[in-house]
Every structure is written in structure tokens, then in C-alpha cells.
């Protein structure tokens, strides 16, 4: 595709609207947003570890690339006029995904639902038409790729391989026998919460700042993602790593992370911490 020639095309307003609806719905499936996110849960839960990592780090970010490559430069008038609809969809997605995350007991489901919530934050950031919002959306997209990949490795590549279950209710006191893993898992969990000194915080803060500049009221509701992400991530980490004595369902001789797992997780942790 010759994008230079495409960008020189001046579409009239009705054509922009028609193209905007079609292209945005396609990218909303890939983001994903509310009503179009049902495929993501099964894709994450049923796929192997490598599939979950590729899906979280690369495939979901293709919508962000497509928005920057097609929607914003080609359809500026339609994007500007329908920002409030995208914001409304984003806010509903954040709240719905967060409540769904709070009720799940499967680790991979929890990380998958949190991906939906974070994706909605960078979606509304890039449509804010502000420098801060667009840069924040890019930063949050990168940060989410590092953190979610690390969390999926922790859930599927470390915990599931050693225990044979992904249910949070079976875990307790892992920090007693896997201290090195617990430290790496803790830092990645902090990144998922968006605490300061992580790339997630920079991206989330700038995205929400861009939202507040355009529509302050919806920005207030979008900011609930900060509270919700802390709630379900702290619950997940606290129940798995601490939560009392070591769970009786597991063997006491479960090994800590090996060198391969350690260096993979350490690389993602380094990219996560600012």
C-alpha cells in the first residue's frame, strides 16, 4: 500500500464517517473493547504460553498501530467528531473488564481481563488528540506488552508447570519456597498496577491527562482503572505469594525459577522499571 499517496487523498465528510465506522470496528475487535472482547478470554486461556505472550505483546498492539497508520491521518474529521463515543466505549470497557477481573479465580483469566482494561486506557489516550495522550498511549502499549508477557510467563511458565493448576484459590505462601520468583512476580505486579517508577505509570498518567483535557467528566470515570487495577493485582499477588502458610495442595520441594526463567523475567522487569 502506498501510504504517501493515500494520505494525499481528501475524503469528504460522509466518506470519512463510512470508513471510520468500518475501520474502527475492525480495530475495536483487535483492541478489544466491550461487546467485542469475548474472543480474547478463550484465546488466552486455551492457548499455550507462547500463544498468550504473542497475543498480549504483539497482536493486541496491532490495533494501536492501525489507528496511528490509518484512522488518525486519513480520517481526522470523523475521529475528532466521534471522540466522545470512543471515550464512552473505553470507559464502559474499563469498568466492565475491571469488575470481571475482580471476580475471576483463574490467573490467566485475570491477566487477560486486565489486558482489556489497560487496552481501553491507551485507546482513549490516542484519541484524545493531544500530544500527552498520544505519547501516553504509545508508552502504555509498550509497557503493557512487557508486563503482561511477564505475568503470563509467571502464571503459565512457572506456576502452572510446577503445580498443574491456574486457580488462585489453590495457591498460598509461595514466597516461602520461591523467594526469587516472588520478587520478580512482585515487580511485574507493581507494573500492572501502574505504580510510580514503572513505564505503565508514565503511559497511564499521560493517557488519562489527555482524556482530562478533552472530556474531564469521562476522565474521572476512566481514572477508576487506577483503583481497580491495584485491587485485583494486589489480591492476585497477596493470595499467591503470601496468604498464610504454604498451601497443603503442593509439594514442599517445588523449585524456584531456573536460570532461563530468571533471565527472561529479569529482562522484562528491566524494561518495565523506568
Regions found by a protein language model. Name each.
Residues 148-152, 213, 220-253:
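Predominantly late transmembrane helices and immediately cytosolic-facing juxtamembrane segments
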Residues 1-37, 67, 71-85, 133, ...:
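Juxtamembrane/interfacial segments at transmembrane-helix boundaries in multi-pass membrane proteins
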Residues 31-44, 95-110, 157:
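C-terminal ends of transmembrane helices
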Residues 57, 87-90, 111-115, 140-141, ...:
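Residue-level recognition of transmembrane alpha-helices
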Residues 50-65, 115-126, 149, 178-185:
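Small-residue-rich segments of transmembrane alpha-helices in multi-pass membrane proteins
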Residues 44, 124-129, 204-219:
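Interfacial segments of multi-pass membrane proteins
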Residues 178, 234-274:
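Cytoplasmic/organellar membrane-interface segments at the starts of transmembrane helices
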Residues 1-11, 102-114, 118-166:
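Alpha-helical multi-pass transmembrane bundles of energy-transducing inner-membrane proteins
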Amino acid at each position: 500500500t502506498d501510504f504517501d499517496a493515500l494520505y494525499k487523498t481528501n475524503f469528504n465528510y460522509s466518506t470519512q464517517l463510512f470508513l471510520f465506522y468500518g475501520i474502527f470496528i475492525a480495530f475495536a475487535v483487535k483492541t478489544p473493547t466491550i461487546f467485542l472482547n469475548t474472543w480474547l478470554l478463550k484465546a488466552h486461556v486455551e492457548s499455550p504460553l507462547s500463544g498468550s505472550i504473542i497475543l498480549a505483546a504483539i497482536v493486541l498492539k496491532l490495533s494501536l498501530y492501525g489507528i496511528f497508520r490509518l484512522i488518525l491521518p486519513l480520517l481526522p474529521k470523523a475521529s475528532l467528531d466521534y471522540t466522545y463515543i470512543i471515550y464512552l466505549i473505553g470507559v464502559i470497557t474499563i469498568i466492565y473488564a475491571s469488575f470481571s477481573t475482580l471476580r475471576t479465580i483463574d490467573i490467566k483469566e485475570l491477566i487477560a481481563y486486565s489486558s482489556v482494561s489497560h487496552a481501553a486506557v491507551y485507546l482513549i489516550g490516542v484519541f484524545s488528540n493531544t500530544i500527552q495522550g498520544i505519547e501516553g498511549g504509545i508508552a502504555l502499549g509498550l509497557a503493557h506488552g512487557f508486563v503482561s508477557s511477564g505475568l503470563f510467563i509467571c502464571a503459565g511458565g512457572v506456576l502452572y508447570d510446577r503445580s498443574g493448576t491456574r486457580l488462585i484459590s489453590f495457591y498460598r505462601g509461595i514466597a516461602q519456597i520461591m523467594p526469587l520468583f516472588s520478587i520478580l512476580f512482585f515487580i511485574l505486579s507493581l507494573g500492572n498496577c501502574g505504580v510510580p517508577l514503572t513505564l505503565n505509570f508514565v503511559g497511564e498518567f499521560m493517557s488519562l491527562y489527555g482524556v482530562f483535557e478533552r472530556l474531564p467528566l469521562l476522565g474521572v470515570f476512566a481514572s477508576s482503572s487506577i483503583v481497580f487495577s491495584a485491587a485485583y493485582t494486589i489480591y492476585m499477588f497477596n493470595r499467591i505469594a503470601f496468604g498464610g502458610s504454604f498451601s497443603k495442595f503442593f509439594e514442599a520441594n517445588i523449585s524456584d525459577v531456573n536460570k532461563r526463567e530468571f533471565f527472561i523475567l529479569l529482562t522484562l522487569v528491566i524494561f518495565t522499571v523506568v
